[in-house]
Amino acid sequence: MKNTKKITLACQVCLAKNYSTNKSVTNRLEIKKFCKHCNMQTLHKEEK
């Protein structure tokens, strides 16, 4: 797994860091995922 880095996805509503994943692209990752703290699907953005 060369050229990949581990990132954390944080909820944009409550700022909880819920998910971690690997990525190999250079732009910032934004995904709609379920947040257990907000109890709904929200936008999660990449944290460093």
UniProtKB/Swiss-Prot annotation:
InterPro entries: Ribosomal_bL33, Ribosomal_bL33_sf, Ribosomal_zn-bd. Gene3D superfamilies: Ribosomal protein L33. One of its GO terms (biological process) is translation. The keyword Protein biosynthesis does not apply. It holds the Pfam family Ribosomal_L33. Keywords: Ribonucleoprotein, Ribosomal protein. It comes from the Bacteria. GO terms for cellular component: cytoplasm; ribonucleoprotein complex; ribosome. Disulfide bonds: none annotated. GO terms for molecular function: structural constituent of ribosome. Belongs to the bacterial ribosomal protein bL33 family. This is Large ribosomal subunit protein bL33A. It comes from Metamycoplasma arthritidis (strain 158L3-1) (Mycoplasma arthritidis). The lineage of its organism: Bacteria, Bacillati, Mycoplasmatota, Mycoplasmoidales, Metamycoplasmataceae. The gene is rpmG1.
